[in-house]
Amino acid sequence: MKLKDTLNLGKTEFPMRAGLPTKEPVWQKEWEDAKLYQRRQELNQGKPHFTLHDGPPYANGNIHVGHAMNKISKDIIVRSKSMSGFYAPFIPGWDTHGLPIEQVLSKQGVKRKEMDLVEYLKLCREYALSQVDKQREDFKRLGVSGDWENPYVTLTPDYEAAQIRVFGEMANKGYIYRGAKPVYWSWSSESALAEAEIEYHDLVSTSLYYANKVKDGKGVLDTDTYIVVWTTTPFTITASRGLTVGADIDYVLVQPAGEARKFVVAAELLTSLSEKFGWADVQVLETYRGQELNHIVTEHPWDTAVEELVILGDHVTTDSGTGIVHTAPGFGEDDYNVGIANNLEVAVTVDERGIMMKNAGPEFEGQFYEKVVPTVIEKLGNLLLAQEEISHSYPFDWRTKKPIIWRAVPQWFASVSKFRQEILDEIEKVKFHSEWGKVRLYNMIRDRGDWVISRQRAWGVPLPIFYAEDGTAIMVAETIEHVAQLFEEHGSSIWWERDAKDLLPEEFTHPGSPNGEFKKETDIMDVWFDSGSSWNGVVVNRPELTYPADLYLEGSDQYRGWFNSSLITSVANHGVAPYKQILSQGFALDGKGEKMSKSLGNTIAPSDVEKQFGAEILRLWVTSVDSSNDVRISMDILSQVSETYRKIRNTLRFLIANTSDFNPAQDTVAYDELRSVDKYMTIRFNQLVKTIRDAYADFEFLTIYKALVNFINVDLSAFYLDFAKDVVYIEGAKSLERRQMQTVFYDILVKITKLLTPILPHTAEEIWSYLEFEAEDFVQLSELPEAQTSANQEEILDTWAAFMDFRGQAQKALEEARNAKVIGKSLEAHLTVYPNEVVKTLLEAVNSNVAQLLIVSDLTIAEGPAPEAALSFEDVAFTVERAAGEVCDRCRRIDPTTAERSYQAVICDHCASIVEENFAEAVAEGFEEK
């Protein structure tokens, strides 16, 4: 036997290298085979419910890192709730209708307008489901736990029926109406868009300053007067039917030198406009308030058949332009509102593809709307005063990335205005985890217009509306519920397979159809109505979930998207918000803080992370950032996170190895019998437990990460485990001192493994497989530990906080001695302490081997004053010299009792007593040489 064999060197097969990329899929299959998700739900039956409702990602393509961050965050929350006494099922979902899938099929050569619609929709459905399958595997590879066998998908018959019923209730309450308001119109998609489908980019446009000649000045202006107008959308002049001024804005009638004409502009803008138009020696002839100009009639710049009326509008400002805007009710929301109030014609001169129509005039007909500027300039002639190119923020179709226009077309709307206050009142009841999120959603609802819910596309849920022979729209409870039942049985494709009369209840009649003939609506619903109905299609209809949901967690862009549409439909139906809490996340940016895009080549695919690091590192990264704001991710950042993971893993490996001979049922030492330092570490760990439990409850992942890393680095590695080897390796295997420390080791190991499970389930299960004395076969079936409090806890914490200060001072003294070449390692030192009464009392209270805690070979607490050469602090001074004696071959301390023993071992008296007591046979035979 060799002397080193008398040491209790920790033994474990738990590998230092995790091998996550290859091991994770193996563990995940094991969990699936063991039906862990189902077993967890069974365990928690009857406990308080917690419903995190999954916002459905769009089923198209592989997931990106933003998807991963969001789904991992949800998984951490659901797992922590499941391990905290809640019944917390997770039903993942997918959004499957809409234009992107139509675009994919188009790129694949599918020609929608040349094939049977039902066959086309079948292709859309097949593609969508293939993407659901692809993304399901992507999410499962991240270690996300949920009911993957029974997700919700917005194209399933049961979901579509639930969506129809949401619409039906809104129709019954009078919230659905048809109108020809201007809507966001995407000529590139040939469809209306909702606000949530808009994104803004900078666009360079031609702006024109031109003049309308007064035709009837109403006794205020002469007919040789011209009202100066500014526009950034020249094509809309073809539909201009009025000029709008601000009632309380001051306007001036001016005549520049050398000009026969007189002009009206906003007084505040006269100086800048004079410079722009090249006017000199401008004479101000008169000043008017805007309201004095009301109902003056002007000529259209070129269309002699059209008169343009001067009207008042609150939207007019003097921030730019001339303080007067031309008004085309068919091409703008403000224009429409003031136009309708003043009985102006709602003219639309652009078709669904962005092509100018016949009513725009023969010079314009057939031109693309963006290309008409030269023609407009030619038609304006000498009425054009100036033109310039401007860059401004402009709305784009978020899918096609093309600019859009406002365009008045008959559409179906959900009236938000009818119950806006009810929605705002509900927002006040929701808990927002960021105050700015509440303000953002509140302001969006307060300021938004009615919701355009109709789309002129094919792949989506049909609007369950019929038309009588006289054109009357039919959307009554009887017909809508009948359609819902048909969809529930056959799916929404039945709408296109059957004639209108076969979609109506048997023997249905309507006074507007004396001949019994009906037509059906051909528009489909906005996809935001699809996902916005999920509270009904999923949360209400799934018995394991509770409505309203406890939490919605999505990206901050969903304040205008899913948070918004879900809120509107839920309040419209039931008068309550669909969620009790909202937690929003920022976007994942690259390592430089720039937006990720394929064109820049700075994207990171979750699959690449899994191959290089493992999903576990991506999960740990999610907790290492403040995801309420935009976050950064790169392979370098993930490499740093991987180092943190390695530190966590190897620390826990040390605990596993050094409790391998510890049976908690037999070897645990009662708390009251622990040393003071062990009690201190137990208390510090329980503080960590409380911090992490509280942070899980508040969804504060970064708090968990920081607290965990700090505990492992500072409390364990830099202190407790730093001197632990002197105990667990050196002392007798069954000695009280070793069992005391092992008791703390094991307690920390078991509980920290549970605390890590929601974040690092793969690693936690791997650790758990080495803990043979724990009852649960999977740590995921256990509960998070509760924080324990101890007697005299504050007193112990105060004592050891003071000792840590003392320890820091001692380490400075040792460092000085090391720099002066007095010692090499701290274990070579004899440290003499010159304490005052406070420190003396402290060292007595610590009641431990202080030399062991400081990792020095010898320590003397001296009486009397410190020598002049001592390193002095306010309460204590130190001197350092090399310890007397020789190095013990077993404990490596320098000790004056170190000597060669009769059994061929050069060891100190302390080690000799341990060896002679525990290894009598080896002592009798003598140890082998090193």
UniProtKB/Swiss-Prot annotation:
GO terms for cellular component: cytosol. Disulfide bonds: none annotated. Binds 1 zinc ion per subunit. It comes from the Bacteria. Its EC number is 6.1.1.5. A motif ('HIGH' region) lies at residues 57-67. InterPro entries: aa-tRNA-synth_I_CS (IPR001412), aa-tRNA-synth_Ia (IPR002300), Anticodon_Ile_BEm (IPR033708), Ile-tRNA-ligase (IPR002301), Ile-tRNA-ligase_type1 (IPR023585), Ile-tRNA_ligase (IPR050081), M/V/L/I-tRNA-synth_anticd-bd (IPR013155), Rossmann-like_a/b/a_fold (IPR014729). L-isoleucyl-5'-AMP binds at E554. A motif ('KMSKS' region) lies at residues 595-599. It catalyses: tRNA(Ile) + L-isoleucine + ATP = L-isoleucyl-tRNA(Ile) + AMP + diphosphate. ATP binds at K598. The keyword Iron-sulfur does not apply. It is found in: Cytoplasm. Its cofactor is Zn(2+). One of its GO terms (molecular function) is aminoacyl-tRNA deacylase activity. Zn(2+) binds at C888, C891, C908, C911. Keywords: Aminoacyl-tRNA synthetase, ATP-binding, Cytoplasm, Ligase, Metal-binding, Nucleotide-binding, Protein biosynthesis, Zinc. GO terms for biological process: isoleucyl-tRNA aminoacylation. Monomer. Catalyzes the attachment of isoleucine to tRNA(Ile). As IleRS can inadvertently accommodate and process structurally similar amino acids such as valine, to avoid such errors it has two additional distinct tRNA(Ile)-dependent editing activities. One activity is designated as 'pretransfer' editing and involves the hydrolysis of activated Val-AMP. The other activity is designated 'posttransfer' editing and involves deacylation of mischarged Val-tRNA(Ile). IleRS has two distinct active sites: one for aminoacylation and one for editing. The misactivated valine is translocated from the active site to the editing site, which sterically excludes the correctly activated isoleucine. The single editing site contains two valyl binding pockets, one specific for each substrate (Val-AMP or Val-tRNA(Ile)). Belongs to the class-I aminoacyl-tRNA synthetase family. IleS type 1 subfamily. This is Isoleucine--tRNA ligase. The lineage of its organism: Bacteria, Bacillati, Bacillota, Bacilli, Lactobacillales. The gene is ileS.
